[in-house]
Amino acid sequence: MIQTIESGIPGFDQLTVSELAEGGIPEKSTTLVYGPPKTGKSIFCNQFAYEGLLKQEPCLYVTTDQGLKQVQSNMMGFNWLIQSYIQNQTLYIIDGISQLSGTKFEDTNNLKSSSVGNPADMMVKVGIGTRSVYKKSNHFISILDSLNTLFAFNQEQMVIRILKAYLRRNREAGGTGLIAYTEGVTDSDTENELKSLFDNTIRLDGEYIRVESNFEDIDEVKSNESTYMITDKGIVVNGK
């Protein structure tokens, strides 16, 4: 039986139950959360991360689209309050966008500033962050939200190389990783290559959620689909 982590998203775990897995996000796997703009990709990632924090799962959170303060504000809108997890260092954040907007903050043990325009620096800080959360637990959650800005500031193949290194590091350390991406940011060939790098994909289109899991050990792809809603408490999946 494949071990999974409860998602904290009502209806999602029931949707993904199978004879192979208990339902939820497969533990120590990588998942691409993608779809058109404004369909709940960031909400899905944040909801999963917050559920983990509630259960004392350390989280490495890389934000490239919005600065730390905006991330906190967005999560607060769903009553997901993360300040205490920042203070107790369960949550480790790498802010890859605030430097570009001129917003400055002091680096701390678990808050690091970087730049999407300097992916080498980001990867160094991801390495440091991964070691930090791994020391707390040999299983943790990692979020990268999102690939969009990385593609905007760097050549596509460079981003793919960075992503491969990020995913490899995540797997080696035992992290369960979610990465967000908006369809159409790159060409179709790059998107297909992107999807092939992940163990699982979750597509949100504003009405339907489609989950595909590639179980390499048995050479089988499992697929599930349902409708979903975005509520004031986050995403709710309506069941099979």
Go through the PLM ranges and name each one.
Residues 75-114:
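Nucleotide-state-sensitive switch-loop elements of NTP-binding domains
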Residues 175-176, 180-240:
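Phosphate-binding/switch region of NTP-binding enzymes
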Residues 65-69, 98-102, 148-149, 183-187, ...:
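Conserved nucleotide-binding/hydrolysis micro-motifs of P-loop NTPases
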Residues 48-52, 129, 161-172:
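Catalytic-core regions built around general acid/base machinery
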Residues 99-165:
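Phosphate-binding/switch loop-helix module in NTP-utilizing enzymes
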Residues 1-78:
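The Walker A/P-loop phosphate-binding site
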Residues 58, 90, 137-141, 172-180:
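Loop/turn-to-beta-strand initiation segments
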Residues 1, 6, 27, 117, ...:
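NTP-binding/hydrolysis catalytic cores, primarily Walker-type P-loop NTPases
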